[in-house]
């Protein structure tokens, strides 16, 4: 999801040339090419008991989890992973750190989506089932093609009742500051991102660039969490037409 370019920002064509040169030298740099114009807003309004029941999570570390009608990058959100004590539900912060690019400040400090799964940066985690996770979601939002501050946000869910879905996610530990200049948050953080793929037929008329990889049934969830990467990678495909419905429009929160 890209905003309007402000005065003084780098010319996008020049920046693309610099990035292309960097990626030729440092292959992991391609991880940041597709972070813009993707899913950077979603909701999770079901109970933690509902999540645990679907994914058979035996451990719950979320405390008292409230409805989350608007989850933005760098916010805390519930995630399911396989831990030392079995499958667990816990809170993580949304967004991987970007690869370090010498002499260049990343355009986006948080990699919220993973599209180029052949990148060395992402392969470090994708190939290891212990670094894969399930991200509970009840709806997600995409902007229209305007892409500026006047963009209209459209919310997608399975139907009006917003049943649980899961993004195909990955997670890692990261040491650093995930706060603000006024309120630093320095320490060890658990962070997550999730996969995107080609826009599905339901999403493409609003947002043709991409759509999240969604896992709708137990077989798909278990394949993502346990299978070798060659098998898990088969899940990177858009849902068929009719799998998603538009359930809201205009607001940056899905309060239903």
Task: Give residue spans per PLM region.
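Short linear sequence motif anchored by a di-proline
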Residues: 3-5, 15-256
């Amino acid at each position: 999801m890209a905003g309007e370019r402000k005065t003084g920002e780098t010319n996008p064509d020049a920046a693309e040339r610099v990035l292309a040169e960097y990626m030729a030298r440092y292959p992991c740099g391609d991880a940041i090419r597709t972070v813009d114009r993707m899913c950077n807003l979603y909701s999770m309004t079901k109970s933690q008991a509902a999540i645990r029941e679907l994914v058979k999570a035996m451990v719950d570390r979320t405390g008292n989890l409230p409805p989350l009608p608007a989850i933005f990058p760098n916010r805390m959100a519930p995630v399911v992973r396989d831990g030392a004590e079995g499958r667990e539900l816990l809170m993580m912060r949304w967004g991987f750190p970007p690869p370090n690019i010498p002499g260049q400040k990343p355009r986006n400090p948080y990699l919220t989506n993973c599209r180029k799964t052949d990148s060395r940066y992402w392969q470090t985690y994708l190939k290891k089932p212990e670094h894969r996770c399930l991200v509970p979601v009840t709806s997600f939002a995409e902007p229209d093609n305007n892409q500026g501050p006047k963009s209209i946000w459209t919310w997608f869910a399975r139907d009006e009742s917003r049943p649980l879905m899961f993004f195909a996610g990955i997670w890692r530990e990261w040491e650093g500051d995930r706060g603000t200049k006024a309120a630093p948050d320095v320490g060890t953080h658990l962070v997550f991102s999730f996969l995107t793929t080609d826009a599905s037929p339901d999403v493409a008329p609003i947002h043709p660039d991409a759509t999240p990889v969604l896992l709708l049934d137990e077989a798909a969830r278990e394949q993502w969490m346990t299978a070798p990467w060659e098998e898990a990678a088969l899940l990177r495909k858009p849902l068929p037409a009719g799998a998603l419905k538009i359930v809201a429009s205009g607001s940056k929160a899905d309060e239903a």
